[in-house]
Amino acid sequence: MKILVVTQYFYPEEFKINDLVKGLVDRGHEVVVLTCKPNYPKGKFYKGYKFWGVNEETLYGAKVIRVPVIPRGNGKSLRLVLNYFSFVFFSCLYVLCHRLRPDRIFCWDTSPILQAYAGMLVNKQTKAPLSMWVQDLWPESVSATGKIRQKGVMSILTTMVRGIYKRFDVLFIQSRNFRKSIEEKGHFKAEYVYAPNWAEDLYTEPNNIDLDKYRNLIPSGFVVMFAGNIGAAQDFGSIIKAAELTRDEKDIKWVIVGEGRKRAEAQALVEQKKLGNTVTFLGRYLSYDMPSFFVHADVMLVVLRDEYIFSLTIPAKTQTYMAFGKPIVSMLNGESNKVIEEAGCGFTANAGDFKALAANVIKAKNMPKEVLSRMGNNGRKYYDANFSKKRVIDLIAKKIENQQKP
């Protein structure tokens, strides 16, 4: 079966779509990926790529077509708008100029949802069944991260999103709560299929971890580790307030592994509060290095700001930490806390409740190591039963294969 995958992001950028494409190829399908020149997350093209021209290459056994795109730069609003719409323009232009005749069309919907337009255009030409894996809810996620808040713009985006959902036959959703938000925008013909995210193999099968590789970077003590993007959604103001409340617990160390547009602001706040002995920023490292950091953590931290949109989602790091067998401390609302509590793999606090977060960290620090270890094992068992990569890829692949042309 010929499957067209439309995604703005693809290898060497690190997203779940890479695994899914490989999984579809492994099942014997002929896969074509329509994407752009890689530039995420640093905002500039990876080595070997430039703006002009269309690149064609083979990755994971799939044919990969890369159209031009304006790189996202520093991630500010105007540059992101140019980045998003340039991919829409060049991907649709490619579709209009080339004959693509897939049997199925699959769109990967992390922000921006607008990338689906190229897939919709191929659907209009061929009537091939159309499916999409919804990773972010638009336009709510744009508003919640502070990128766009003007009511007029939000109204236009809502109309565009409504028009996109209307065209799809199947909507895979990474959180069950997504369905409610989508249906608030209208009644669509799409079938909803719950397809949660999985963790990368290096977390589920962490073989040959170099325990000493980064040991000298990790302060001694009870380590609360955050790993990932330091952005508006992560509410570092509240994280730092929680760290401040644990200042007198001298052996509690908050370790931040990651990068993002709010890092400088967060570091300035740490300096202002004189928390240099409590909070350590280590910067960004490649994903394959993460197990060498995680292994030194006592608990892993998951945080999202107090926004309705964030209460509907399960941040991917939840599955990652569960897969790695680490207990979790959270400060967020909704679905992710339900999962942590159901699995019995950590301590939950509501979004913005830095006092509860601090209390949970102190509680975890005072627990016997074997109790924390049991929590981590609970998380891994829950992950294997509900979120494993093979289970989710098989579910998505079978649904795509069984779609019927109208």
Task: Please place each PLM-identified region on the residue numbering.
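N-terminal subdomain of nucleotide-sugar transferases
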Residues: 1-57, 248, 405
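Membrane-proximal helix-turn-helix segments that form the acceptor-binding/catalytic region
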Residues: 96, 114, 121-125, 152-171
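Carbohydrate-associated surface elements
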Residues: 37, 177, 195-198
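Nucleotide-activated donor-binding/catalytic signature segment of Leloir-type glycosyltransferases, i.e.
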Residues: 257, 264-292
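Acidic donor-binding loop of glycosyltransferase active sites
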Residues: 169, 294-311, 326
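A short, well-ordered alpha-helix in the C-terminal region of glycosyltransferases
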Residues: 363, 370-385
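Conserved donor-binding/catalytic core segment of Leloir-type glycosyltransferases
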Residues: 199, 217-234, 239-243, 255
